[in-house]
């Protein structure tokens, strides 16, 4: 029991302390709640104020944007008005310049007329001497005034152009500044949206903190951390507010500056308008003065014409009457001749058209001729090439023929040598036959042999004559080399056969005469005959188609034939060279003509 009482006594003070602590904690929490509620109300009021300020700033920005748009519209309208005014003034200046040029021309005409009138004798013009200098001085003064005004107008035009250029530059600057303002407004709006989001986040955190109080020991630390966060947020909001106020002040100052600039621009435009109005007034005054001057000039011209007519009437009545009539007749004749002149002009135009057509046709014809000439040149070049080829072929053929003829000459020389040898042999045989003793033959009773010998000699003579006739025919006819070769082969065959017959007869005679003749004269004859016949056989064996033994005139005929062939070849070469020269000259002539035509076309 005592222990239980002691325990109750021990526990009761702890519970009392705990209760006291709980009461203190409740008091602290209630106090902090009150503080937090006060702070939250203050923050809410601040947030409301900030929202109002942001709304006011947005309205100000919208108003400024509207003002900028209005300023732009005004600038555009002012530019259009300035352009229209400048165009009008430029047109008026051009018209005034044209009128001024007309006035100067009329003044020059009047001065020339006055110079012509001054040539008239001074006795006829005594009363005009006093009026003309005064009028001339007035006109000169007015012209100088017009010139001075035109110079002033040119200077003012230059000034207005420079002013317009400056206005364009200012407009560009204003447009750039408006774009900068719009960009700044967009950046401010983004900043305001970010700050609104931060405030919404902080406002969402505050009731969560209020609704979730922890009874643990970490509540104090959390509260302090939250308080620090709130303090930092409040300081940031204050800084951003100060920045926004500074920026708003800057924007207001810039707007004031732009308003001042706009006012200055409006004042300048009003000045420009006033200047333009004064310019209009000056132009009107100038036009009035110009009209007055024109009227005065017309009056002066009428007076001068009247005075001239009076003087002409006074000086010569009849000629003055006849001259206008003559002038009228001339005018009527000129008026009547106008259709004729028009017809002549039409004829000239038609002639010009015909000449142009003829020129075009000639150009086409020349082009066709040039094309034909080019074709002819190509054809001639082709013919020249063919002729050169043919000439080369002919040269080759001539060379071949010359080689063949040289070979033929060599063969003819060999045949001449053979013919000489045969001839000497025949003469020798005839001498030998003449030297024989007839008594021995009579005693030997060789009647048949003598007959055979005479017949063989006659045959040889006949064959020699036939060969000479053949050579004469060859000289006269002048056949080709192939026919000559055939004839040479035939004559060679006949000569060879005759030679064989002569050898046979000699052998017979030698066999018959061996017992009754001395041994001294006959062996050399047989040796000579063998020696003379052996080269013929060897030549025939080596040259089977060689020409026969011919006389000395045959070589002359061959030489004559070769000389004629050479002459013909030279004549052909000369003809070919002349033909080639003519073709070259013709081509050069055509080329020169074509180049001249090209030059004429370029000219």
Swiss-Prot record:
Q: Which residues carry this modification: Phosphoserine?
A: 546
Q: Which GO terms describe its biological process?
A: cell projection organization; centriole replication; de novo centriole assembly involved in multi-ciliated epithelial cell differentiation; multi-ciliated epithelial cell differentiation
The places in or outside the cell where this protein is found are: Cytoplasm
Xref: InterPro entries: Cep63/Deup1_N
Keywords assigned: Cilium biogenesis/degradation, Coiled coil, Cytoplasm, Phosphoprotein
Q: Name one GO cellular component term.
A: deuterosome
| Coiled coil regions, renumbered to chain | 14-59, 85-197, 227-278, 336-399, 454-480, 557-600
Family to which this protein belongs: Belongs to the CEP63 family.
| Subunit structure, interactors included | Interacts with CEP152; the interaction is mutually exclusive with CEP63.
Described purpose of this protein according to its UniProt entry: Key structural component of the deuterosome, a structure that promotes de novo centriole amplification in multiciliated cells. Deuterosome-mediated centriole amplification occurs in terminally differentiated multiciliated cells and can generate more than 100 centrioles. Probably sufficient for the specification and formation of the deuterosome inner core. Interacts with CEP152 and recruits PLK4 to activate centriole biogenesis.
| Protein name according to UniProt | Deuterosome assembly protein 1
In the record, what lineage is assigned to the organism producing the protein? Eukaryota, Metazoa, Chordata, Craniata, Vertebrata
- Name the encoding gene, please: DEUP1
């Amino acid at each position: 029991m005592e222990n239980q009482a002691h325990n109750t006594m021990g526990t009761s003070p702890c519970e009392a302390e705990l209760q006291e602590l709980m009461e203190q904690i409740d008091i602290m929490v209630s106090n902090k709640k009150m503080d937090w509620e006060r702070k939250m109300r203050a923050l809410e009021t601040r947030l409301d104020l900030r929202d109002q300020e942001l709304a006011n700033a947005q309205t100000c920005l919208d108003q400024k944007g509207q003002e900028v748009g209005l300023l732009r519209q005004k600038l555009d309208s002012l530019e259009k008005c300035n352009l229209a005014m400048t165009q009008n003034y430029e047109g008026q200046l051009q018209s005034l310049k044209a009128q001024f040029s007309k006035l100067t021309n009329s003044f020059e005409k009047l001065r020339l007329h006055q110079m012509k009138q001054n040539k008239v004798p001074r006795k006829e013009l005594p009363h005009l001497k006093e009026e003309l200098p005064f009028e001339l001085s007035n006109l000169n003064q007015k012209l100088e005034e017009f010139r001075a005004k035109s110079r002033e107008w040119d200077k003012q035009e230059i000034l207005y152009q420079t002013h317009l250029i400056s206005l364009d530059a200012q407009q560009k600057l204003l447009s750039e500044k408006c774009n900068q303002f719009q960009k700044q407004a967009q950046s401010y709006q983004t900043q305001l949206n970010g700050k609104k989001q931060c405030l919404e986040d902080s406002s969402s955190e505050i009731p969560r903190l209020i609704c979730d109080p922890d009874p643990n020991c970490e509540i104090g630390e959390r509260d302090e951390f939250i308080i620090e966060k709130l303090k930092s947020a409040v300081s940031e909001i204050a800084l951003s507010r100060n920045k926004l106020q500074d920026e708003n002040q800057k924007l207001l100052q810039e707007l004031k500056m732009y308003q001042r600039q706009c006012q200055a621009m409006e004042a300048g435009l009003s000045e420009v308008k006033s200047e333009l109005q004064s310019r209009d007034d000056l132009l009107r005054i100038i036009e009035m003065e110009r009209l007055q001057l024109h009227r005065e000039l017309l009056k002066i011209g009428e007076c001068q014409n009247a005075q001239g007519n009076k003087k002409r009437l006074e000086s010569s009545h009849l000629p003055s009457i006849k001259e206008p009539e003559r002038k009228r007749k001339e005018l009527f004749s000129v008026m009547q001749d106008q259709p004729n002149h028009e017809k002549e002009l039409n004829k000239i135009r038609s002639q010009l058209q015909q000449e142009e057509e003829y020129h075009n046709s000639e150009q086409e014809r020349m082009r066709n001729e040039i094309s034909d000439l080019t074709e002819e040149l190509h054809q001639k070049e082709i013919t020249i090439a063919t002729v050169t080829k043919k000439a080369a072929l002919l040269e080759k053929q001539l060379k071949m023929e010359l080689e063949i003829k040289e070979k033929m000459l060599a063969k003819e020389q060999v045949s001449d040598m053979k013919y000489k040898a045969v001839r000497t042999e025949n003469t020798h045989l005839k001498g030998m036959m003449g030297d024989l003793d007839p008594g021995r033959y009579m005693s030997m009773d060789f009647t048949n042999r003598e007959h055979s010998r005479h017949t063989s000699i006659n045959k040889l003579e006949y064959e020699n004559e036939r060969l000479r006739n053949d050579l004469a025919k060859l000289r006269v006819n002048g056949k080709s080399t192939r026919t000559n070769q055939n004839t040479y082969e035939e004559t060679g065959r006949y000569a060879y056969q005759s030679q064989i017959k002569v050898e046979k007869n000699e052998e017979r005679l030698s066999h018959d005469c061996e017992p009754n003749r001395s041994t001294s004269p006959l062996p050399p004859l047989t040796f000579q005959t063998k020696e003379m016949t052996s080269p013929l056989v060897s030549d025939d064996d080596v040259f089977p188609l060689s020409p026969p033994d011919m006389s000395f005139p045959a070589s002359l005929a061959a030489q004559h034939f070769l000389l004629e062939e050479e002459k013909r070849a030279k004549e052909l070469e000369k003809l070919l060279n002349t033909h080639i020269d003519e073709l070259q000259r013709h081509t050069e002539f055509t080329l020169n003509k074509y180049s001249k035509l090209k030059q004429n076309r370029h000219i």
